[in-house]
């Protein structure tokens, strides 16, 4: 199962807990030796679901939480570790950052696909905006070779996760269907880490077909 494959990918880093609203997934997790938490089915985003799970687990306020989505079966542990390292740095330096995430260079062809979310960064590697559109637009050039493609890995402390989930859903979040825009719309910062990754999420039937071909190798 994909969620188990994803959990196994990151299990060497630290404790893995699967958050789900499905009893079937709870049973699967138990069968494969993973802890799981049953959450409400009414959440609008995966981050809201993780927040409920974290509160059920009664973790400390400064505990580092990494949200790896269950449809990322090829995510490399080096990518997750890079996000963990940046969250630790933010804690140590007491930086005013709500979320940490990551990105990689993607081709212009991939950037055309709205399922590949693009991110624009400021000079401090914080996110200015995320979009399904092909951004930034280069007025004076017909084509740009690479874009910054967002990877759906999010790092928080328990406190920053709770704070994020207290924010009201924002207009841009609802337009783009990108929950991370909620933080930016409310004036909070998202730190971005550049990584090298061949991973891809399973968002379309084509993605699933590609994944199945890889699994069979």
Labelled PLM ranges:
Residues 1-19:
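N-terminal glycine-rich phosphate-binding loop and ensuing alpha1 helix
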Residues 13, 61-62, 92-97, 188:
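Short, high-confidence coil segments that cap the C-terminus of an alpha-helix
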Residues 16-18, 65, 99-100, 127, ...:
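Hydrophobic/aromatic residues located in beta-strands of well-ordered beta-sheets
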Residues 17, 23-85:
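Short phosphate-binding loop-to-helix
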Residues 20-21, 75, 156, 203:
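A conserved hydrophobic position in a structured secondary element of the catalytic/binding core
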Residues 75-170:
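Conserved core of the sugar-phosphate nucleotidyltransferase
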Residues 145-217:
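Conserved alpha/beta core of the MobA/IspD/sugar-nucleotide pyrophosphorylase nucleotidyltransferase superfamily
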């Amino acid at each position: 199962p994909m969620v188990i494959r994803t959990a196994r990918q990151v299990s060497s880093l630290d404790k893995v807990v699967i958050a789900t609203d499905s009893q079937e997934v709870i049973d699967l997790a138990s069968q494969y030796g993973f802890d799981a938490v049953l959450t409400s089915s009414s959440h609008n985003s995966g981050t809201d679901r993780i927040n409920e799970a974290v509160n059920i687990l009664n973790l400390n306020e400064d505990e580092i939480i990494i949200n790896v989505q269950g449809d990322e079966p090829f995510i490399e542990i080096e990518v997750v570790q890079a996000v963990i390292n940046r969250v630790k740095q933010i804690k140590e330096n007491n930086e005013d950052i709500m979320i940490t995430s990551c990105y990689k260079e993607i081709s212009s062809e991939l950037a055309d696909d709205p399922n590949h979310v693009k991110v624009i960064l400021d000079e401090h590697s914080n996110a200015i905006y995320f979009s399904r559109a092909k951004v930034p637009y280069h007025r004076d050039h017909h084509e740009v070779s690479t874009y910054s493609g967002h990877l759906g890995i999010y790092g928080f402390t328990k406190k920053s996760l709770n704070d994020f989930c207290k924010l009201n859903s924002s207009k841009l979040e609802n337009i783009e269907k990108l929950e991370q825009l909620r933080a930016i719309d409310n004036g909070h910062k998202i730190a971005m880490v550049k990584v090298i990754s061949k991973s891809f999420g399973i968002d379309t039937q084509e993605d699933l077909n590609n994944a199945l071909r890889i699994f069979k190798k």
